[in-house]
């Protein structure tokens, strides 16, 4: 009941001071816009969003490093390591290898259409559970025999055939090679770069997929490991470290030492890795977020605090009268905080809506601002954000917490200082 009274009084005060209220709401909204844009960008990068819904159980190996007394070589993982080590990990539910992506030319009856293709294996669709609208994944037998059976996204099937229905079994030319459609999946977004493609096909369709390089461990694959629910990250890492130890004491290395530089690592860890052969500098990452938090929270809080202090000076006579009639300092403080919480809440809603509009209109450009080495999306790829990215419960929780913190920091100190004035001094402010 008291909260209802406080909010009613806050609404009346807001109508009595439209200029102050407008400036306060807009100031809060601007701060929330910047905060929510960053929050949503990192949510899309780190949280389990379609089709990368297994991110919390996914470990990544992007590269390996081979070192001897004279030099160091780094590259992606070799086919031999993928086949002999990662496919048979006991702590993994399943592992998948990706032999890169490429831009290919697809020919239908009318024209050539560029495509973004991903070369992988049948396990890919278990690590990244794309929703099949029609058909099924290509099989292990397809991969082993190099059969050109492919999976299309629904958006690309629409572009290629003019429909998403009944395309399984159809053939088309991809880089002048005949391929057959065995499945159609719900399209993801280029904003999830580890899983996105328009066409998925076995890596054995690509020339040189099993080539042996100058070093046994180095090649062209990235590995994604879906660990068993009963296992931990440490279990997977220990199993891989034991394989590395055995390799380094054997004759296979021929004087070279293998190092995976802290990998396998959790998916969200891997997103902060700048260089494939250098471990993540967590000190730099932490200070980066501390700096962002300080700028986005405390700078607007100090500005709003100044506005509230000025208003508190004008309200001293009113506060003095309330105290004279028995209102406690605590009750008045709670009331002032609720008054400002209403304004902060309205600013938060305004900022959240503007943040959604900014992200919807800017597309990939706003996401590329947070990449050290941004990728340039090829023509025709899906850059859209799914509903699970826009309206995630965690985003609303973050907005609410930021709103509460901003309100407390900006309102608490000026309100407390104003309420410390003696009753007589507060009443004299009216003269």
Enumerate the language-model features and the residues they cover.
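Membrane-helix entry/capping segments
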Residues: 1-5, 12, 16, 247-291, ...
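C-terminal membrane-exit region of the final transmembrane helix in multipass inner-membrane proteins
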Residues: 6, 389-431
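Intracellular coupling helices
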Residues: 7-19, 302-343, 417-429
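Hydrophobic alpha-helical transmembrane segments of multi-pass inner-membrane transport and secretion
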Residues: 16-46, 278-317, 345, 405-406
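Transmembrane alpha-helical interface segments in multi-pass membrane proteins
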Residues: 19-23, 27-31, 317-363, 398, ...
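Structured, solvent-exposed hinge/loop segments at the ends of secondary-structure elements
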Residues: 39-166, 173-179, 368-381
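Membrane-interfacial segments
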Residues: 42-53, 317, 358, 362-374, ...
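Mid-to-C-terminal secondary-structure elements
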Residues: 123-137, 150-277
């Amino acid at each position: 009941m008291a909260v209802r009274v406080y909010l009613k009084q806050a609404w009346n005060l807001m109508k009595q001071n439209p200029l102050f209220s407008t400036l306060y709401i807009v100031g809060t909204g601007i701060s929330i816009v910047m905060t929510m844009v960053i929050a949503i960008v990192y949510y899309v990068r780190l949280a389990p969003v379609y089709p990368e819904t297994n991110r919390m159980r996914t470990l990544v190996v992007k590269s390996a490093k081979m070192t001897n007394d004279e030099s160091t070589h780094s590259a992606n993982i070799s086919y031999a390591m993928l086949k002999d080590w990662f496919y048979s990990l006991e702590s993994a539910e399943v592992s998948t290898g990706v032999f890169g992506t490429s831009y290919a030319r697809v020919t239908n009856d009318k024209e050539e259409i560029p495509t973004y293709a991903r070369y992988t294996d049948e396990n890919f669709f278990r690590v990244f559970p794309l929703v099949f609208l029609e058909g099924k994944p290509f099989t292990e037998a397809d991969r082993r025999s190099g059969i050109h059976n492919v999976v299309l996204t629904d958006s690309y099937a629409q572009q290629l055939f003019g429909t998403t229905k009944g395309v399984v079994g159809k053939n088309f030319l991809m880089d002048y090679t005949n391929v057959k459609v065995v499945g159609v999946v719900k399209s993801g977004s280029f904003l999830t770069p580890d899983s996105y493609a328009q066409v998925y096909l076995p890596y054995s369709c690509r020339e040189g997929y099993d080539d042996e390089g100058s070093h046994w461990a180095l090649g062209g694959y990235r590995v994604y490991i879906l660990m068993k629910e009963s296992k931990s990250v440490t279990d997977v890492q220990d199993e891989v470290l034991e394989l590395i130890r055995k390799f380094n004491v054997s004759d296979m290395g021929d004087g070279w030492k293998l190092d995976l530089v802290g990998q396998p690592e959790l998916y969200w860890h891997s997103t902060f890795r700048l260089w494939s052969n250098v471990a993540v500098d967590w000190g730099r990452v932490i200070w980066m977020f501390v700096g962002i938090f300080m700028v986005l929270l405390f700078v607007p809080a100090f500005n709003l605090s100044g506005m509230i202090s000025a208003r508190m000076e004008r309200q001293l006579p009113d506060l003095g009268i309330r105290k004279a009639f028995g209102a406690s300092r605590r009750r008045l403080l709670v009331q002032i905080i609720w008054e400002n919480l209403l304004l902060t809440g309205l600013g938060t809603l305004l900022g959240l809506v503007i943040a959604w509009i900014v992200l919807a209109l800017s597309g990939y450009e706003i996401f590329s601002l947070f990449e050290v080495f941004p990728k340039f999306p090829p023509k025709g790829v899906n850059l859209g954000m799914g509903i699970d990215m826009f309206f995630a419960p965690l985003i609303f929780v973050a907005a609410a917490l930021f709103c509460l913190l901003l309100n407390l920091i900006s309102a608490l100190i000026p309100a407390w200082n104003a309420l410390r004035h003696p009753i007589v001094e507060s009443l004299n402010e009216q003269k």
